[in-house]
Amino acid sequence: MHTPDPAQRLLAGPPLDGNPERLDAHLTRLGALPCADNHLDLISSLEASGLLGRGGAGFPVGRKWRALAERTSGTAVVVVNGAEGEPASAKDRILMAYRPHLVVDGAILAAEAVGADEIVFYVGREHEAAVAAMGRAIDERRAEVRQAMRLVTAPVGYVAGEASAAVHYLNSGDARPTTTPPRVSTRGVHGRPTLLQNVESLAYAALIARFGDRWYRSVGRLDSRGTALITVSGAARRPGVMEVELGTTIGEIAAAAGTTAPRVQAVVLGGYFGTWARVGDAWRLPLDPDVMKAHGLTFGCGIVGLLPTERCGVSTTAEIMAFMATESAGQCGPCVFGLRAIGAATRRVANGAAGGGELGDIERWVSQIPGRGACRHPDGAMQLMASALEVFGDEFIYHARTGRCSITGSRGEAA
């Protein structure tokens, strides 16, 4: 066993261009999974590390495990969330496809820590390589664990990975999210207390169990410790998934992906539930959840989307809004009618076909829709839309008044 390179932890090991890491290679590289006599020790280590959930919400992992462990006794269920329905993210599928045993390690540790007798691996069915790799890894590990383990392919859809949607799907076959109590941690799969954790969070828990919280905190900048998986897309010569120290600036991440500030007009951070930022505001900003929040931006699931200077931000936002409208769970008016209306209005502005009142309507809907839906889907969409109106405000006005795009010079945005 050897300690991973400081800058490469989750993705340390064989190249990410071949087959999944085999169990024997995984054990040779990292050693056997520790079996602590007191599983609360692991929870304390997770708390001391400061590890945050990597599925988007950013809740402290150790605190989440402790809350469940203190009120269950062998009756809980662990759900490994690998649905990854966010189009701009690829980190989870990469981790599952190439480091499946690290994910299984984390799931086993979580089950032992919270007193679970069942582990469900919930993997997006469209991620075929991840489904295959996780299926093989689970089969290889069944004999060593006391928990029942099963793989369930999640339906294709943006909301399918939301906690309540995942639990509803596992219980009834309907991936429908809700904000209605009880929480899944109280009444989840089979009506039992359920720990639902993102695959990256679990993989990191497996490393912390081996190397300790001090090791985890030995890298990172400012007050942020550890590393994170980031998906970079857009104006990048080398787009894809990379592992970086928390606190690394957006500009440094972009440089590693092969681009420079003059090639980038704006940055979308955190994905389709995230926020747009002007390149001048984002470039020196550290990838730090607290710092980003203080600037009104989102870390989310680690997405850095670089909008090229030749692309229209209005049109790109319209495409995202149209997608979010089609991904509605169809259970409330703000989502079904509100997102559809705002998507259509944004598209008319982008296409140079606005009738004169679209911008006012969009601004009004952005303020009215949040908090009124049956789940958080419309809230996330409106957060992105609100940031687009701020970052691309002048371009929205230009489109609406002239019917043309100042970026492409075309009528609307054709490119």
Task: Specify the residue positions occupied by each region the protein language model found.
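Histidine-anchored nucleotide/phosphate-binding helix
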Residues: 99-113
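Gly-rich Lys/Arg/Thr-decorated short loops/hinges at beta-loop-alpha junctions or inter-strand turns
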Residues: 22-29, 80-92, 186-188, 231-236
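Hydrophobic alpha-helical positions that pack around
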Residues: 128-246, 257-261
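Ferredoxin-type iron-sulfur electron-transfer modules in oxidoreductases and energy-metabolism complexes
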Residues: 29-45, 73-76, 82, 91-95, ...
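Short acidic, glycine/serine/threonine-rich loops at helix termini
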Residues: 57, 63-65, 89-92, 131-136, ...
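Cofactor-/ligand-binding subdomain signature composed of acidic, glycine-rich
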Residues: 1-43
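Short loop-to-beta-strand transition segments
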Residues: 64, 119, 259-272
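Conserved phosphate/anionic-ligand binding catalytic regions in large, soluble enzymes, centered on
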Residues: 47-68, 156-168, 325-337, 373-385
